[in-house]
Amino acid sequence: ITVPVLCGVLALINFGSLSVTAAKAEAPVPEARYCAEGEARYLDEGDEPSYDGQGGIVGASYDVYYDYKTIVEDVYLYSVPSFGNANSSMPNSCAPVAGTNIVGYYDRWSPNLIPDYTPGAMVSGNYRYYPDMSREPVKNTIASLYNLMQTNVNGGGTSESEFMSGLTTYVTNAGYSLSYTSFHQNATMVDLPKLKTAINAGKVGLVMCSKYNFVYGIMHYDGHTQVAKENGDAGHMMMVYGYKTIAYYKDGVNFQTDTFLYTCSGYGAAETGYMQLNDYSQINNALVMTIA
């Protein structure tokens, strides 16, 4: 999905003998809307894109063959929550689900974020979040954010401003504050040093994409790596909790280097996986999210 580009227009308006030249002005750029749930596309209505969360996912898995590989960097949080929405009466829900993943993560330290809920437990000296089990407190949080973010009210899915407004209201009502900083770089890359600083500080991020990819798994064999991947043509939001860079070598030469964000899919099945950078995507924004 391409980012909409609207050009300014220089208009000449005539009223009989009166001639008025209008100043060059840019029409307001409509906000992208985010709503993919494993099926995604966008429709053009005139010149303005709208995202309705319906359509197709394209398989984009690939193989890499090499003499050897190195993990250049592997920066990630040990454990995070990953929820999905199983309620068919709330379609196009990736934004409220991403918001629920964020508040679910910080609920460990801010226990009123999800009322009557314990997000995880200490296991062998490490805190582990419980898997998604469609518990009522989580379902209630998704539904609350769905309403606060006005999902599907002003169009299919949720815009960035609706997401931020709804999440801020939810966090404030729970007695906490939300802040955020950008780690966006361009349409296919994020600022990895900024993300690394955030992850090392125990924070999570968020990516907002007009088109995206999701990697279900990276399987390494002897001299061979398989990447199980799909590309989606619709707006999508995912929580981010780290990144991994892999360099491949043949005959002593580094011929390919791939970087992946660790992400929560936001799909109904609540998978965790990756999003490949410098690949099929249109990253509109990337934010480090903090609740305190």
Please tell me what each predicted stretch does:
Residues 20-160:
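Active-site-adjacent structural segments surrounding the nucleophilic cysteine of cysteine proteases
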